[in-house]
C-alpha cells in the first residue's frame, strides 16, 4: 500500500520535513503515526484519514494502533 502525504492533513504535519508529494510505504506510514501520535489532533482527523489509519492498523499492525 502506498500513502501520498499530501492527501492526509495530520500525516502532512508529521512529515513536515518531507515534500508533500512524497509517497510512503504503508508500514512506514503506520510507524510514523504510532511514533508521533502525540502530535496528531484526533479531533482534526478527516473521515478519509481515520479510514486510512484503521486500514494501516489492520494491514500492518494486527488490527491495533499502538499509541
Where are the model-predicted features located?
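N-terminal acidic leader/helix
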Residues: 1-27, 31
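Amphipathic alpha-helical segments that form the core helices of the histone-fold
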Residues: 30-40
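Short, charged early-sequence alpha-helical segments and their helix-coil boundaries
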Residues: 42-67
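A generic structural signal for solvent-exposed, polar alpha-helical segments
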Residues: 14, 22, 38-39, 43, ...
Amino acid at each position: 500500500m502506498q500513502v501520498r502525504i499530501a492527501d492526509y492533513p495530520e500525516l502532512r504535519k508529521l512529515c513536515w520535513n518531507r515534500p508533500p508529494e512524497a509517497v510512503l510505504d504503508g508500514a512506514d506510514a503506520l510507524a510514523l503515526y504510532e511514533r508521533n501520535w502525540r502530535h496528531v489532533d484526533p479531533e482534526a482527523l478527516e473521515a478519509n484519514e481515520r479510514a486510512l489509519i484503521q486500514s494501516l492498523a489492520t494491514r500492518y499492525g494486527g488490527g491495533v494502533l499502538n499509541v
